[in-house]
Regions:
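A structural signal for conserved, well-ordered secondary-structure elements
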Residues: 1-316
């Protein structure tokens, strides 16, 4: 059997924890001062799908909407270059009055078509959706609650599957990943919508998977290496799982990079969230979750089971 090279991952762990602390501080400050650029799903607004008879530049459409009084419209191609998706957060005062009636969305849609048809183009209104501010607020609250519930369930699972110190380390590492990902969106002011929220939840699952694999090897090695120091057990466990972690992350990142570059504007932010989150999650499974086990003074005694249990574990 080939001997695995043991790397001293914990040697720079203090510097890595310091780096994580700085990044967390920057993220929290940015979230508190700049906030997050919420998408239509969370802030409310109107989404309209229109069709043109021939390809058209999005800048031209954006300029027409601004001149008609629609502030900061989002205009993107989807599918063919004749298919346009419009997202309007702020609408003219006259149009705002129409939102009090049941015909709000059709009325806004007709105003948009009129503005875009001013130069003689034949515009086809294909679909229109309106998200009210109250619905957006409910989605924000439910999205935040969903992330908290996910972290609570993770902590319960790891506590039952492993031990409470493992659970605390896993949840703190996941919270680290979520805060840094949210901080990334705050600093870049990329739009945060439901697809990005789904990406953040996917990051939680991906990072947890990496952490569980490391923790499972740590537990196994604590039982096998009875006279080895905890730091050496963790270094050996990380070395044994290193290539599996790197290979999985690398292949996943290749797919996400292709989505980010070629996927179009509609999934650009979704891919960006996953790219950043998986990079951070891979890092945290090594230098945050594992280091936290040492800070929590994990030892073989924490994992001891009754003799009958150990005999069962040792069976082939």
């Amino acid at each position: 059997m080939q001997q695995i090279k043991i790397y001293n991952f914990m040697a720079p762990s203090r510097a890595m924890i310091a780096l994580s602390s700085v990044l967390l501080l920057v993220s929290v400050i940015s979230l508190a001062t700049r906030g997050i650029h919420l998408g239509l799903d969370f802030s409310g607004g109107t989404q309209i799908e229109v069709g043109y008879p021939q390809p058209v530049a999005v800048e031209q459409i954006r300029q027409q909407l601004v001149e008609a009084g629609f502030n900061s419209p989002t205009v993107v191609h989807f599918g063919a270059e004749t298919d346009i998706l419009l997202r309007l957060k702020e609408i003219p005062v006259v149009a705002q009055e129409a939102l009090q009636s049941d015909s709000a969305a059709p009325d806004i849609g007709q105003r948009v078509v009129t503005a875009l048809s001013a130069e003689g183009a034949e515009i086809e209104l294909r679909r229109i959706d309106y998200v009210g501010p109250q619905i957006g607020e409910e989605l924000r609250e439910e999205g935040g609650l969903g992330m908290l519930v996910a972290l609570a369930v993770v902590m319960l699972y790891v506590a039952v599957r492993f031990q409470f110190k493992f659970a605390l380390g896993a949840v703190l590492a996941l919270a680290h990943d979520v805060i840094l990902t949210l901080g990334f969106f705050s600093l870049t002011q990329l739009e945060f919508d439901l697809t990005v929220l789904a990406a953040v939840l996917a990051v939680i699952g991906y990072s947890l998977n990496d952490t569980i694999i490391v923790f499972d090897r740590v537990r196994e090695n604590f039982r096998k290496l009875r006279k080895t120091e905890p730091v050496d057990v963790i270094n050996e466990s990380l070395s044994q799982t290193l290539w599996r972690t790197l290979n999985t992350s690398f292949t996943t990142l290749l797919v996400l990079l292709a989505l980010f570059i070629f996927g179009g504007e509609l999934i650009h932010n979704f891919a960006a969230a996953l790219l950043f989150g998986i990079l951070v999650g891979t890092y945290s499974s090594i230098y945050v979750a594992a280091k936290l086990l040492l800070l929590l003074n994990i030892s073989r005694e924490d994992l001891l089971q009754p003799v009958e249990g150990e005999l069962v574990d040792d069976l082939p």
